[in-house]
Structures are given as C-alpha cells and as structure tokens.
Amino acid sequence: QQTKAVQITFHSDHKLDYGQQVLYRGGYLFPQTFYYRLKLDKICRKLRDKYKFKYDINAILSDLIYARILEPASKRSSYKTASEFLEKPSYQLHDIYRALDVLGNECDFIQSEVYKNSHLLGKRNDAILYYDCTNYFFEIEQEDGDRKYGKGKEHRPNPIIQMGMFMDGDGIPLAFSLFPGNANEQTSLKPLEGKVLQDFGCTKFIYCSDAGLGSEAIKKINHA
C-alpha cells in the first residue's frame, strides 16, 4: 500500500467557487513546537485565571506570533493570515484588540516567564548581556501618548516610540522595554536592567553596548 501509485486528476477548465478557500498555510506548525515548549500556553492560562475573560488568549497570542514570523503586518492583517491556517481561529477580530490591553499590561510577566522556561530548551548564555536601542515610526501627524517626535532611525518627520532590548551572549532576546520617542535612550537602561536583576535572576553578567550606551553614568550604574 505504501508503494502504490496514486493518480490525481486536474481539470484546467474547472472554475473555482467564489469565496471558497483554496489556500492553506501550514508554516506556523514549525514555530508552534517552540511556542508550547516555552509553555506560553500555561502563561496564558494564568492570565485567564487572573482576568476571567471569555476569549481564548492562548489562541490569540499564538496566532499573532505565528503571523508575525510568517508575514509581519497589522493585527487586522494578521487575523486574515491566521484565517488561512490549517487550524481556524476560535476568536473574532475584536477579541484581538481586547487582548492587546492584557498582553501589554502583563508584558513584563510574560517576558520573565518565557526566559525561565527557555532554560528547558537549553542553557542560556546570560553571563554576557548586550544592550541596544532602536525606534519605530508611526504614520500619524500628532503626538499621542508615548509616541513623541524624536530622532528616528529612518529620519522620518513622524512621532516615534523607542525600544531598548537585552540579548544574551548568543544573540537571543532576553528582555525589552518601550519608552517615549523624545526620551534620552540612556535613561532606559536602569529600569530594564533592574527588571533583569530582580525578575529574571540574572545577578552577575558582563554588560556590553556601543559607545552611545556606555556613558560614565551607565558605567557607574553597572559598577555600583
């Protein structure tokens, strides 16, 4: 039976029914393995028990991650991408927008839990930590919240928001934080480093950065 030939017939003049899905995406099955090995489903279960919401935040978070890897786009477009997965979304678009507030509020908790669970996949090279900052522009004309006018990497005349990130010695992300676009990036280090020390348990490491984030004030913080 395994060696038996199978013949498939195609009709070149056959018309497809309008609205019938003919494309299915299966690429998400590869990152799905790591999603569950990092126990993100259990993290989502803790959030569900805390907030008592009705929608499936595990399905939402996992689909957003898969879509971000496969085809980065807006949340609305990511929902459309997820609708083409072999496993259909069990939620609606408005549930995604509701879940974003929870994911934003619990961002630090999610990061620390993922870091702890990442040790189940292998040893982390966290004796050396690299820190750097970047920023992202928004196609808006007026400042809004932390989206402020600042010096953007792409030199666009749009409000930006900045991100600082720690990576381990292997270049794997460890923790990140977002801060206003008009803030001095050097001030972003101390709060995030405090979280790494307290929530991540990284109490002894070598700090590495470029010259812009290696000021005398930062050196004093790391040698205190």
Per-region residue spans from a language model:
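Catalytic cores of nucleotide-enabled group-transfer and carboxylate-activating enzymes in metabolic
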Residues: 149, 167-169, 195-198
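Short beta-strand-initiation
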Residues: 160-162, 216
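Short, solvent-exposed amphipathic alpha-helical segments in soluble enzyme
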Residues: 145-148, 222-223
